[in-house]
Curated annotation (Swiss-Prot):
It is a single-pass membrane protein. Pfam families: Cytochrom_B559, Cytochrom_B559a. This is Cytochrome b559 subunit alpha. With its partner (PsbF) binds heme. PSII binds additional chlorophylls, carotenoids and specific lipids. One of its GO terms (cellular component) is photosystem II reaction center. The keyword Chloroplast applies. Its cofactor is heme b. The chain crosses the membrane at residues 21-35. This b-type cytochrome is tightly associated with the reaction center of photosystem II (PSII). PSII is a light-driven water:plastoquinone oxidoreductase that uses light energy to abstract electrons from H(2)O, generating O(2) and a proton gradient subsequently used for ATP formation. It consists of a core antenna complex that captures photons, and an electron transfer chain that converts photonic excitation into a charge separation. It comes from Mesostigma viride (Green alga). GO terms for biological process: photosynthetic electron transport chain. It is found in: Plastid, Chloroplast thylakoid membrane.
Length: 81
């Protein structure tokens, strides 16, 4: 008995009304929630990345680049001062 897994064919799924009723709501809501996540700045807070205006400070105008992997913690402390 080869070839049949008793699953619905993909063409049946994407041509059904039920599929489009569900996905016409979920797909746009994913885009809207992603846009809100980024535009409100929550993405910066969640992932801990600096905001565009926080890369350079008045005291430090060089690029905050970690160059020594064995003294990385010291370099991080220096950049966060």
């Amino acid at each position: 008995m080869a070839g049949s897994t008793e699953e619905r064919p993909f063409s049946d799924i994407i041509t059904s009304i039920r599929y489009w009723v569900i996905h016409s709501i979920t797909i746009p809501s994913l885009f809207v929630s992603g846009w809100l996540f980024v535009s409100t700045g929550l993405a910066y807070d969640v992932f801990g990345t600096p905001r565009p205006n926080e890369y350079f400070t008045e005291d430090r105008q060089d690029i905050p680049l970690i160059t020594d992997r064995f003294n990385a913690l010291e370099q991080l402390n220096q950049y966060t001062k």
